[in-house]
Amino acid sequence: MIKYYNRKNKDYDIEKVAGEKYLNWTYSSPIGMNLLEVFIKKKIFSKIYGFYCDRRLSQKKINKFINDFQIDMSLSENQLSNFKCFNDFFTRKLKKEARPIKTDKNLLISPGDGKLLAYENLNLNSVTEVKGINYSFYELINNDSLAKEYNNGTCLVLRLCPTDYHRFHFIDNGICENTIKLNGFYYSVNPIALSKIPSVFCKNKREYSIFHSENFGDIIFMEVGATCVGSIIQTYKPNTKVLKGDEKGYFKFGGSTVILFFKKNTIKIDDDILSQSKLGYETSVIMGEPIGNKK
């Protein structure tokens, strides 16, 4: 059971997990864990499933997924009949009015839909994942000199579950450098898996870029792949000015994570998000939702 904080009603909700029985079996049983290490965590498994989700045969999954998880299709830019395969539906764009962007330059917004954790005073040797598991920031980005620039800064971890809108966006005007790709495995990023596999973010396939934002300094913008994520697709044009709310990219099918790192004394995260993070609870947010302010 995954409990998260709902900002709207100021109470806790239970997340309905796609493939929960499969996740529990894989990460809790000896046979499942063996299969995970031998096959599931490897690229070939996610590639095979991604191939299926790109084919017309997968179209039949769409209606069941919508009904099971109560997806609001009135927000979708395209009609259901336009989706030729499951990934067409999964990577759907939303109508602009579905995710309005606050233009106030001092307002920090969420880069996507998902469950958010926030950590201040970043310790480079011990960044906390869900369930209190720690990992090294140095290991995560594999660049010691860059990592040191973010000592005592702020870290945001946005977990996108399969039922979420799966495009991610820029949080400010600015210029984003080229993407750096780091190879890795494809473990699940669901809290069920994070509690069983230490330092998942450091082990999984991931990409990051430096975003030179106009109002929040230089931000490390990282995307982490997961089980069944066929691809991390970057749609932005490097070294070209982007606007707050512009699309940066999207994930194909699977749960995924976006991680942002800010330098010291650049932002102040909203108190409710910080307090829930300290208690170990993620906070549900949507793309464009205010989550903090410029210091």
From Swiss-Prot:
Q: Which UniProt keywords apply?
A: Cell membrane, Decarboxylase, Lipid biosynthesis, Lipid metabolism, Lyase, Membrane, Phospholipid biosynthesis, Phospholipid metabolism, Pyruvate, Zymogen
Q: Please give the catalytic activity noted in the UniProt record.
A: a 1,2-diacyl-sn-glycero-3-phospho-L-serine + H(+) = a 1,2-diacyl-sn-glycero-3-phosphoethanolamine + CO2
The domain of life for this entry's organism is Bacteria
Q: List Pyruvic acid (Ser) occurrences by residue.
A: S256
Pathway given for this chain reads: Phospholipid metabolism; phosphatidylethanolamine biosynthesis; phosphatidylethanolamine from CDP-diacylglycerol: step 2/2
> Which modifications occur after translation, per UniProt?
Is synthesized initially as an inactive proenzyme. Formation of the active enzyme involves a self-maturation process in which the active site pyruvoyl group is generated from an internal serine residue via an autocatalytic post-translational modification. Two non-identical subunits are generated from the proenzyme in this reaction, and the pyruvate is formed at the N-terminus of the alpha chain, which is derived from the carboxyl end of the proenzyme.
The way this protein sits in the membrane is described as: Peripheral membrane protein
Q: Which Pfam families match?
A: PS_Dcarbxylase
User: How does the cofactor attach, per the note?
Assistant: Binds 1 pyruvoyl group covalently per subunit.
Cleavage (non-hydrolytic), annotated site positions: G255, S256
Cofactor needs: pyruvate
Q: What is its main location?
A: membrane
Question: What InterPro entries is this protein classified in?
Answer: PS_Dcarbxylase, PSD-B, PSD_type2_pro
GO cellular component terms, alphabetically, are: plasma membrane
User: Which Cys-Cys disulfides exist here?
Assistant: none
The reply to whether Ion transport figures as a keyword in the UniProt entry is no
Protein task: Catalyzes the formation of phosphatidylethanolamine (PtdEtn) from phosphatidylserine (PtdSer).
Q: Which family does it belong to?
A: Belongs to the phosphatidylserine decarboxylase family. PSD-B subfamily. Prokaryotic type II sub-subfamily.
Q: How the protein assembles, per its UniProt entry? A: Heterodimer of a large membrane-associated beta subunit and a small pyruvoyl-containing alpha subunit.
Name this protein carries in UniProt: Phosphatidylserine decarboxylase proenzyme
Underlying gene: psd
